[in-house]
Amino acid sequence: MSSTIKKIGIVDCNNFYVSCERVFNPISIGRPTVVLSNNDGCVIARSQEAKDLGIKMGEPFFQKRDFMDEHRFCVYSSNYNLYGDMSDRVMSVIKKYASEVEVYSIDEAFVDFSNIPDEELTDRLHLIRNEVKRLTGIPVSIGVGPNKTLAKLTSYIAKKKEGYNGICSYWTLQNFRNLLYTISVDEIWGVGRQWSKKLRKIGVDSIGQFVMLNDSLVRKMMTVNGLKTKMELLGMYCHPVKPVPKQKKNIASTRSFGSDIDSFDQLAEAMYSYIKNGVKKLEDNEISPNRATIFIAGNRHKEEKHHNSKVVKFESQTRDVTQIWSQVYPYLRKMFKEGKKYKKCGIIFHEFMPENIEQGTLFSNTVQLVQPPVNVEKNWEMRQEYMSQKFTTSWEEIPSVFV
């Protein structure tokens, strides 16, 4: 391998949400296991055992409940506090053994291994995989190639093809071009559902067929980004690893309610709760917003399809809960309509400034402070009938060990 060729890897957690649950609920190991979306609506994560039994992503839970009972499934409500914390732990282990790491998603990280000598690369990959498993309990697959697109592809091969044991390097693959004809275009990094449909309409079903297309046709169908994808599949380098995360354009805190509500007090308490959750995200990112969009909406599956939103400009950049609530409250009161039922609300913060140049004072004389809602019946809270404990983020729910 030439010293000038990039060695880009991706560390991908296997069935991440399910794996997080299995770390603390070993009873689910070996049994078909699923994690459900907000309000226990749809399947959003599946163990291999669940996949083998035909459970599909996005399937409504109520349609499969009896089937899952019959096959002794382990079912969990989504526990995002747990998943977020476990993700941080996985990423911290990866960063111990790699200098350039781009956290791509909650369960994936791109790594630039270009400074690792060729003869040491395989050992480094096994070290990372073993250490992540040992220190967090999360199994991962690792793919390495000369660019991000081929790293994603080799990661797919490491997961899906026999004989790789969770690690695949582009440079060790035999008959690579022939292998591309066995993999669907759906598995190309960055090729979404719409592009896949367009490609299939012209008879392109496999990656092997895709890379044989004329460059001008690819660019016309899929823009310059599609052409870059094709170039990377042919071994070129177009997308660098970016260790510094991009500045977030917005931070949202929204949820659907467990049941429809028609009380302003309940709506206000839900909005206040989401503001607090959003402020926690602002604090984690050390940024403060200048504006926020608040919205309330009816149930889109019923006749109550109404939706209302408002952009609130804060008097100064702030992430103080009381300040934000006091400026949001008057607009929320105006937006609420008696007799209407609501299924969802939320707040989206935007127009950020870094912490060190935040302007304004903590409490402005022109903002009349509003007390938060208290002692309100929480009919708005999400249904989470199968929620596991917050094993790593709550002292009250930390596992007990007896000796």
What label would you give each PLM region?
Residues P117-L121, K302-E303, M353-Q359:
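Short, charged/polar, Gly/Pro-enriched secondary-structure boundary elements
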Residues D40, E49, N299-H301, F352-P354:
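Short, glycine-/Ser/Thr-/acidic-enriched flexible segments
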Residues E187, K197-K341, Q359:
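DNA-contacting surface of Y-family translesion DNA polymerases
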Residues M1-M231, S364-V403:
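Gly/Gly-Pro- and Ser/Thr-rich, intrinsically disordered tail segments characteristic of DNA damage-repair
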Residues F314-V403:
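Acidic, metal-coordinating catalytic segment for phosphate/diphosphate chemistry
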Residues P146-T149, E232-M236, S288-N299, K341-M353, ...:
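A glycine-rich phosphate-binding loop feature that marks nucleotide/adenosyl-phosphate handling sites
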